[in-house]
Structure formats: C-alpha cells, structure tokens
C-alpha cells in the first residue's frame, strides 16, 4: 500500500457529536493503552508523526479520523484499560468506543492490537467479545514482536492465536521498530475493504 494522500479529518468526542461527512468505508484501530498503536500507525502510514506517540498512556480521549488515499477512512480509537485512568474517565470513553463500533454505518473492519509479551487482559477479551457480537470483520495485530527473539515471537504468536481461537489469516505479527508485518497488515486492510458489506451478509 503506497500512501499518496493522508489527511486529518477531525476528532469525534461523543457518540452523537461530529463525525466525517466523507462517504468512504472506515477501518478502526483499537487496543489497550500502551499496546503500541500510535507507533504501528506511524509505520503503517510511513509517517514519523502521523499518530502522536504519547509518553503518558490513556491520554487520547477522542476518535481521530484520517482520509487515506481517498480510499478509506482510518479511525484511531482511544486506548482502553489503562489502570491509572479514573473510573469516571473510563465511563466516559466506553460509550464512545462501543457506540462508534456498534453504530457506524460505514465501518468496514476493525484492527485490534495485542502486545506479544503479555497475555490478553479482561479488557481485551471484553473488546473481542463485543466485536464478535457486533459481527464486524476483525484483524488482530500482535505488536512489539521485535522485543522477543524470533523463535520466541513465533511461538508466542502461535500460542496467542490458539488461545483466542483465531485463524492464521486473522493474525498479523507486527514490529513498528523493524517494519516487520507492515506489508502483511496493509494487505489485510485491502482484503477488509474488498469484502462485501458485513451487515448485508449478516441479514442474509
């Protein structure tokens, strides 16, 4: 995927607030705080500062939308599950995240991020179950594989895939540091965009 056009469209702070008027399919990226989402997006888009990398996890409070190649809209969702964020703040974010994922008429697919070094948290499982209930096609990007030795990373990816009941084509090992998995993830996005509307498929 060659990035010829990348334009920030704006933020959505509440489920009934502003959202892009552009009628392109949307791909959402979601993961717990500190999973490496900003670094992954920067590498995927081949930009050093496309998504701001914060030193304080849990800072992002809005959904940020970007026009990619006039082909699709990338939705960068707030990180979930950061322990130091107050319960009140989490209570504000959950309706935004779940409301968007459950009601966006143009959502074509979701990429959920997991850190290869850690077992999925309860928040991760809750998100997976929610996405499964909604029925939206989902890819799991397993991040930070460069933090382990290659053999360890492969074994860990296989272990996580089996534990989560994921097929090989649903999982993309990724390193924002080395760029490993960048082309595979870009290809997975194109496959999501080429799929028929999953809502129509569900109705049938």
From Swiss-Prot:
The keyword Cell division applies. Residues 23-195 form the EngB-type G domain. SUPFAM superfamilies: P-loop containing nucleoside triphosphate hydrolases. InterPro entries: G_ENGB_dom (IPR030393), GTP-bd (IPR006073), GTP-bd_ribosome_bio_YsxC (IPR019987), P-loop_NTPase (IPR027417), Small_GTP-bd (IPR005225). GO terms for molecular function: GTP binding; metal ion binding. CDD domains: YihA_EngB. GO terms for biological process: division septum assembly. Its cofactor is Mg(2+). Keywords: Cell cycle, Cell division, GTP-binding, Magnesium, Metal-binding, Nucleotide-binding, Septation. It comes from the Bacteria. Mg(2+) binds at residues 38, 60. PROSITE patterns: G_ENGB. GTP binds at residues 31-38, 58-62, 76-79, 143-146, 174-176. Belongs to the TRAFAC class TrmE-Era-EngA-EngB-Septin-like GTPase superfamily. EngB GTPase family. Necessary for normal cell division and for the maintenance of normal septation. This is Probable GTP-binding protein EngB.
